[in-house]
């Protein structure tokens, strides 16, 4: 194979040199320059062959374009592959655009997909937070249908285990699609002082973050450093949950929930554990020095997503990218962790216990839905698009 490749390149070099010489057949070249010319021709030919060899790599499609073009998840057992900022996931499900205590924002982005555990947790948080006095969740970006690098925005959110929740409570009216696309979020942090705007902060914000941190699945909650400081300054009594709340750039209008690698995802790369303590120490004080806010010395440096090709991602992500579509988005929308993800065609009503059992889930009452209490069951798997 190697010899054949070398012979091919040699033949290409000879053809190039012959064609290049033909351009100068009618030009009289002084004798001292002829030897130099032969060397120059050979050099040009080698460079041309090298350029041709490098061209496929340079022209390889960016992974963000490939994953960003997918409108539906890959039908498979739920599995996160790679790291939060370099990976993909299969078997994703969508959170419904509307729930009893949540609404999805910016729906045109098609980023309401995640690992079933992530989606179930968001729905659970919406119910628990409502019991704590939070009117309802405005759900931001979760992941693309198959994860992977995004066309815009996040570096992470690639393996279905990250989700953004706005720090603006859900209004007491249903938002139109236009409002969800254009409604501005409330910025809670002053960009000059990096401190929370006291007039906008309420104890309900603290309760919401504490509730999110209370779940065993949650490993990190990313917030603006100003919000972390506000919590450090005001939380009394139990402060153990503050360990999960980590300061990071941005996150001034939403918080970022990150859950750990889930069972059935052997190729998922876990993040390091958070440091012991409540995080209200020198590591937080650093955020209120000049260093974190200095201008970027190389603002034109490409972002990772603008360089990542499929070769940059775990090899298993190619199979995820090529995996079969489900019948529809509705067929893989997660209506509460008590209702199976629809199997095959679109469901117009909750499945009967017999159908639920046939799909691999435990038997459920036919009336179970996102508006009812949800029993603990296994996660059923969606089936491929019929005929596909």
Stretch-by-stretch model annotation:
Residues 42-51:
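Bacterial N-terminal signal peptides
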Residues 75-140, 201-211, 215-218:
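Active-site acidic/histidine clusters and adjacent loop/turn architecture
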Residues 60-62, 175, 179-380, 384-388:
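Catalytic cores and adjacent binding grooves of peptidoglycan-active enzymes
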Residues 53-59:
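Sec/Tat signal peptide C-region and signal peptidase I cleavage site
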Residues 130-132, 156-161, 213-214, 248-251:
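Extracellular/periplasmic catalytic domains that process cell-envelope and extracellular macromolecules
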Residues 131, 144-198, 257:
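Acidic/His-rich structured neighborhood in mature extracellular/periplasmic domains
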Residues 62-75, 121-152, 222-244:
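Extended, low-complexity, intrinsically disordered C-terminal regulatory tails
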């Amino acid at each position: 194979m190697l010899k054949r490749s070398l012979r091919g390149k040699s033949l290409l070099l000879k053809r190039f040199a012959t064609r290049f010489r033909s351009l100068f057949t009618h030009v009289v070249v002084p004798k001292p320059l002829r030897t130099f010319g032969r060397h120059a021709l050979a050099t040009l030919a080698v460079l041309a062959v090298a350029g041709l060899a490098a061209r496929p790599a340079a022209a390889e499609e960016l992974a963000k374009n490939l994953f960003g073009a997918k409108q539906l998840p890959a039908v498979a057992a739920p599995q996160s592959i790679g790291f939060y900022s370099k990976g993909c996931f299969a078997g994703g499900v969508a959170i419904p655009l509307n729930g009893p205590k949540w609404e999805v924002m910016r729906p045109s982005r098609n980023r309401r997909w995640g690992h079933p555990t992530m989606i179930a947790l968001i729905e659970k948080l919406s119910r628990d937070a409502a019991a704590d006095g939070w009117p309802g969740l405005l759900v931001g970006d979760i992941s693309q249908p198959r994860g992977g690098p995004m066309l815009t925005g996040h570096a992470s959110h690639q393996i279905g285990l990250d989700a953004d929740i706005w720090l603006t409570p859900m209004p007491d009216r249903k938002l139109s699609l236009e409002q969800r696309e254009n409604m501005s979020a409330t910025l809670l942090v002053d960009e000059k002082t990096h401190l929370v705007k006291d007039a906008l902060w309420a104890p309900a914000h603290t309760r919401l973050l504490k509730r999110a941190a209370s779940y065993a699945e949650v490993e990190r909650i990313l917030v603006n450093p100003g919000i972390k400081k506000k919590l450090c300054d005001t939380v009394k009594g139990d402060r153990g949950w503050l360990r999960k709340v980590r300061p990071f750039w941005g996150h001034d209008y939403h918080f970022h929930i990150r859950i750990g690698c889930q069972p059935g995802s052997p190729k998922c790369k876990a993040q390091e554990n958070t440091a012991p303590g409540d995080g209200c120490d020198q590591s937080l004080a650093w955020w209120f020095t000049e260093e974190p806010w200095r201008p970027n010395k190389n603002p034109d440096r490409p972002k990772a997503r603008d360089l990542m090709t499929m070769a940059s991602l775990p090899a298993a992500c190619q199979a995820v990218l090529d995996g079969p579509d489900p019948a529809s988005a509705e067929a893989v929308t997660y209506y509460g962790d008590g209702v199976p993800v629809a199997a095959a065609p679109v469901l117009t009503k909750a499945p009967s216990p017999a159908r639920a059992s046939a799909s691999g889930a435990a038997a459920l009452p036919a009336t179970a839905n996102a508006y009812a209490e949800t029993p603990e069951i296994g996660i059923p798997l969606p089936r491929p698009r019929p005929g596909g």
